[in-house]
Amino acid sequence: MASDGQTPIGYDVDINKALAKVMGLKEGTTKHSEFPTIIPALGTKFDVGISSFTITPEREQQVNMVSYLNVGSAWGVAQGNPKNFDTSNPCGTTIAVQTGTAQETYAEELSTQCVADGKEKISVMPHELQTDIATKIISGQYDATLADSTVIGYTSAQSEGKIVQLGETFESAPQGVAINKDDEELTQAIQAAMQYLMDNGYLADILASYGAQDAALTTAELNPTVN
């Protein structure tokens, strides 16, 4: 999100504009919406949803998904890890996540396991905006954040290193563009346009601007098989 708090920015915004251009459309309108509300609004309020959606069997039952990235999860902490956060033992800590993401689910599962092991639960703090999370991590309100590895990398760059990745990337999974299942024509157009961006290096170029070029896939699959 830009400094005005209203204008969406990031590689998904740039990819969305590139898809529209390939499809011969005007640039179109990119609107910000709370993460959990995007998929239910496809086909009514929105034509396409592109917001780091991890492809899951549950989402593929709701909408068509066209893959374009393979992204893992990563821990982010303030520079120097002042809270001494231990990725191998997050029990009893306060962790920020973006609402509705795979990381929110994963953090809740970790917390449940902590309690089952007789340890203190994790305080999982959902937020709509990653920028809000970054501010609270830097100020010391939270111990760590859990997000897409590409998000952690971008946040680190934007914060000039005030937030850094801690540990290795894990739980890699494909992400996709979401389209209403009833709109087969738009689905096919998005898949073809995404493949064009891949084949001609445009997708990698866009991602490189955010340090995320290694996440690019080479085949835009429709509803790929996932666990």
Language-model features, listed with the residues they occupy:
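Extracytoplasmic small-molecule ligand-binding "clamshell" domains
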Residues: 1-50
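Ligand-binding cleft/hinge of the Venus flytrap
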Residues: 2-3, 16-26, 103-126, 156-158
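Extended ligand-binding regions for polar small-molecule ligands
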Residues: 13-22, 94, 101, 177-214
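Short helix-initiation/N-cap motifs at beta->coil->alpha
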Residues: 28-40, 82-83, 122-135, 171-173
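A ligand-binding cleft/hinge motif common to bilobed small-molecule-binding domains
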Residues: 53-60, 108-109, 139-171
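Periplasmic-binding protein-like
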Residues: 70-77, 157-195, 213-227
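Flexible hinge/capping segments at coil-to-helix
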Residues: 78-95
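Ligand-binding clefts/hinges and TM-proximal coupling segments of bilobed small-molecule sensing domains
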Residues: 105-124, 164-165, 195-227
